[in-house]
Amino acid sequence: VSFSERGKEKLTNKTKKPMPVWAMIITDVVLTAAAIGVFMLFDYVMPQSSGVKGEVIATVDSSAEGSFTLPNAADSSQAESTAQDDGEPAVTTTAPQTEKATTTLRTEQTNRKNWGNQDTADYRSDQNAISSITNGAITSEELGSASTDNAQVTVYKKSIGEGSNKITYFVADVYVTSASEIKSAFADGEFGKNIKDSVFSMAVENKALFAINGDFYGNSERSIVIRNGIKYRDDADVCVLFTDGTMQTYSPSEYDSDAVIAKGAWQAWNFGPALLDGSGNVLETFNTTKYLNSANPRSAIGCVSAGHYIFVTVDGRNEGYSKGATLSELAAIMSDEGCMSAFNLDGGKSAMMYFNNTIVNAPDGGGRDLS
């Protein structure tokens, strides 16, 4: 198709109408939303490998292997699960404890901020809640035990209270011959962001005898991350397992990365807060938020002595079965289990315990994938 010169001139001189203001505003909003959407998808959804290989900061000396003795050392060579002779789990009810958990005042710190859970403050422990655990009757059911040459695990299902106050929790009593038997795993074996997998899958892939969720390090870009003697990150409130089998918790102002690494940090978890003072006493204050201090599903790690550890998962948000535990109740449970030090791990839908090729607890909402 051809146009005359006059027609071309008319088309050339034709003035374009400007876009209405309202249309310009809508266009800008749509483009901005699209840009934010792409950023959100990339930054918060798409798996991203950090590319960080980590720095080896500790190894367990071969001479230290087997330095701790398993309770059933004579039978430890048989890697098999055990149950009651009649095939039914034992169910026992313990009377109220004669020795009550006490509280201790932690070092006073002003303007503390736990970067794993921002905008935290010091919340006083609840003496009534602590007493309800230490003076209550606990029903205990052994779910089974399993052992290898280097580890022994016995898992219990326990409950305390009734009706809307009932708490149901699971306790793994773990003995190892060396700290090297306590291992951590990344989702897909990769340190990064938005890389997630189920506790079950990670346990199976790593051939774990027992597993529990950790601190969900991928939820925060600022925290300490030490896995199997390799440091990936180090800037927050932390619980450290050392190569000698001892465990210690640190608040932000107490934590000295260089000193901890020099001591031989084997594993480190960031979430918190610390629950006990290192002598088995419930802390007088918890560095946390109001929401995290309320009754929720929980996971925690505790140390009785070098080579002897307690892992606890508390179910919650299911009235009549388990309401969940406050930090005071969780601390009292860890103290009641004989722990000297203990640390709160990621909870809520993350709280899951794996044993004998199954998730033994009832995770809130079916649980969620973790990093």
Q: Where do the model's predicted regions map?
A:
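A short, polar/proline- and glycine-enriched secondary-structure boundary/capping micro-motif
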Residues: 192-196, 258-265, 320-327
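Active-site-adjacent helix-turn-beta-strand microarchitecture at beta-sheet edges
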Residues: 217-292
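Short Gly/charged-rich anion-binding patches and loops
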Residues: 197-198, 270, 329
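Short, solvent-exposed aromatic-acidic interface loops
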Residues: 187-192, 254-256, 314-319
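Conserved, well-ordered active-site substructure
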Residues: 220-241, 286-340, 350-371
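Sec/Tat-exported extracytoplasmic proteins
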Residues: 203-206, 215, 279, 334, ...
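Zymogen propeptides
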Residues: 2-235
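General beta-strand structural signal in soluble alpha/beta enzymes
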Residues: 210-214, 241, 249, 341-347
